[in-house]
Amino acid sequence: MKGAKQLRNMIYNILENSDTVSGVTLKNSPNSSTLLLDRTDGKGRMTFHTLFPGLTLAFIFVNAPVWPESDENSNLKPLLINYCVSGRSELLLDDGSYIYLKENDFCVSEQTAQKEYIFPTRQYQGIKIYFDLPLLLQSCGELLKSFSLDLPTLEKSYCGNHKTYINEADSELENIFQKLWRLSERPSAFHLQIYTLELLHRLLNMEIRPPKTCGFYTETQVEIAKRAAQILSDDLRQHIPVRQIAERFSVSETSLKNYFRGVYGQNISTWLREIRMNEAARLLSDTKRPIAEISEQVGYSNQGKFAAVFKKQFGLSPLEYRRSKNLENR
């Protein structure tokens, strides 16, 4: 049995341990705690609301490829419910395989010893709910019983043998998660509590569908996809054939495309086009370089084609986009 002090402080310890990680800062306020990520490769925030002793909900906003984790937190094992609002999140499973949480996916798991959380698309928004079950049952057992919420049964049903359950939320679950998400900017403790209890009731009383059985990738497959992405984006002026990259890693072109789509959620051509356009947008906003030069920098020798692709993504021509950013920065 864990000591009472450890039980009382599990969520506190997670936050305090995270505060020791480079680039992560903990800010406390009367009604919440926020972890802020500020690194050269991006920013993010996780805002934590304690709803009951032993039950904490966090809203996650990330614009970065990685959120580092404290090694100390791997020793703490809260029950977790994750829900992806947008973006993609990489999950390392206990058997060493990887799976990707995408929009409207949810998972129920125990904390795993991940050294960092990976967001392949560099953008992620979601909800994470932490359960310190011994403390929650000790402090709110009668309340949970009055609502017929048997959380040990929930844990056993979804995480038997320490497995991770992942699936797409059905319409009823999605509706509850979205009600919670709409409170992310203007939280109401009462409504957060009510909707979280509603979520637990639904999870306990719905028919549990078989978890996803596809979309699992080995460490090698994930590494091949990530290295391919690095090669493709290192110099956007270059147009490197996918076949050439596949040969470099001794896999078929089809396999490489499948690994890539599994990790990034897009085919290679769509992903690379967005990378090119996002870099062009950055150069238009942050520099005074001529548009023709920027076009070549991101791999378009034909400025007209560049302008058409750019407008399709951003709704403005490159010149209009630059002017709008100049007005914003005045």
Task: Say what each PLM segment does.
Residues 265, 299, 311, 315-318:
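Conserved phosphate-binding and hydrolysis motifs of nucleotide-dependent enzymes
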Residues 1-76:
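N-terminal low-complexity or simple alpha-helical regulatory segments
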Residues 75-95, 133:
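Glycine- and acidic-residue-biased ligand/ion/polar-headgroup-sensing regions
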Residues 226-234, 238-246, 262-304, 323-330:
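Terminal helix-turn-helix DNA-binding modules in bacterial transcription factors
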Residues 235, 252-255:
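Conserved mid-sequence domains
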